[in-house]
């Protein structure tokens, strides 16, 4: 485990983007596992800036996203497909057919979970997985006490997660209560993992995740066992 302390959010974003860009430059057809939420936005902005300067080419890159709300159309402004399009995909030259986000609208959600796992396997696995961390230690939408051995599955969102996401909706009652997410097992199978955390409110959970016991009550704690984990954090 490598822990990097950033001096600011912009420094965190540059450092994270540098790791991602190095992965793409060294292996243009890399499979990137991508995350949503407020923390990765600066990282994506930095990647877009470097792309516009001609420093990085995404034309052969493949992306797989961690999760999606159940019941939201891809065109819904709160869907994670929409988030990725607006914050990254439409600003770079990654082919749309190379971008994968699980569907929250599939008629058979269990089949969608199995198909998403098969997709990742057929792509040869994830080369670099980007992660944020929730206040309760969730990664993806793997809530506390979810089994570590799960692959892609449907989850009922915890109260703290719903409250945290309510700021993106006009009313807390509009926040979806279920999501499809890559499981802990799926995440741990990535060749490299990059965890980013920003803000003083993330300090306690990062300490629990990285230095506390490995337990399903803190989902991110399993990352202690990953053979190639980099953590970039800024608690300012």
From Swiss-Prot:
Coiled-coil parts of chain: none
Molecular functions (GO terms): glucosamine-6-phosphate deaminase activity; identical protein binding
Active site annotation, chain numbering: 67 (proton acceptor), 136 (for ring-opening step), 138 (proton acceptor), 143 (for ring-opening step)
Keywords: Carbohydrate metabolism, Hydrolase
Gene Ontology BP terms: carbohydrate metabolic process; glucosamine catabolic process; N-acetylglucosamine catabolic process; N-acetylneuraminate catabolic process
Keyword Nuclease appears in the UniProt entry: no
Pathway where this protein functions: Amino-sugar metabolism; N-acetylneuraminate degradation; D-fructose 6-phosphate from N-acetylneuraminate: step 5/5
InterPro entries found in the cross-reference section: Glc/Gal-6P_isomerase, Glucosamine6P_isomerase, Glucosamine6P_isomerase_CS, NagB/RpiA_transferase-like
One cellular-component annotation, GO: cytoplasm
Reactions it catalyzes: alpha-D-glucosamine 6-phosphate + H2O = beta-D-fructose 6-phosphate + NH4(+)
Enzyme Commission number, as recorded: 3.5.99.6
Cited Gene3D superfamilies: 3.40.50.1360
Family stated for the protein in its record: Belongs to the glucosamine/galactosamine-6-phosphate isomerase family. NagB subfamily.
Function: Catalyzes the reversible isomerization-deamination of glucosamine 6-phosphate (GlcN6P) to form fructose 6-phosphate (Fru6P) and ammonium ion.
Protein name: Glucosamine-6-phosphate deaminase
Source species of the chain: Lachnoclostridium phytofermentans (strain ATCC 700394 / DSM 18823 / ISDg) (Clostridium phytofermentans)
Lineage: Bacteria, Bacillati, Bacillota, Clostridia, Lachnospirales
């Amino acid at each position: 485990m490598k822990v990097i302390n950033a001096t600011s959010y912009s420094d965190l974003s540059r450092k994270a983007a540098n790791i991602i860009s190095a992965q793409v430059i060294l292996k243009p057809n890399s499979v990137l596992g991508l995350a949503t939420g407020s923390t990765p936005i600066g990282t994506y902005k930095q990647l877009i800036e470097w792309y516009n300067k001609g420093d990085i080419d995404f034309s052969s890159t493949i992306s797989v996203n961690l999760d999606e709300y159940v019941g939201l159309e891809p065109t819904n402004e709160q869907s994670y497909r929409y988030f990725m399009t607006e914050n990254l995909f439409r600003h770079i030259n990654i082919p749309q057919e190379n971008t994968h986000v699980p569907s929250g609208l599939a008629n058979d959600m269990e089949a969608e979970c199995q198909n998403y796992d098969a997709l990742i396997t057929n792509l040869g696995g994830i080369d670099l997985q980007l992660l944020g961390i929730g206040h309760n230690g969730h990664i993806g939408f793997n809530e506390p006490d979810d089994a570590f051995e799960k692959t892609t599955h449907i989850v009922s969102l915890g109260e703290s997660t719903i409250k945290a996401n309510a700021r993106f909706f006009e009313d807390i009652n509009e926040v979806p209560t279920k999501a499809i997410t890559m499981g802990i097992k799926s995440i741990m199978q990535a060749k490299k993992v990059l965890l980013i955390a920003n803000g003083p409110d993330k300090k306690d959970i990062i300490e629990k995740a990285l230095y506390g016991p490995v337990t399903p009550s803190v989902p991110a704690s399993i990352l202690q066992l990953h053979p190639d984990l980099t953590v970039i954090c800024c608690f300012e």
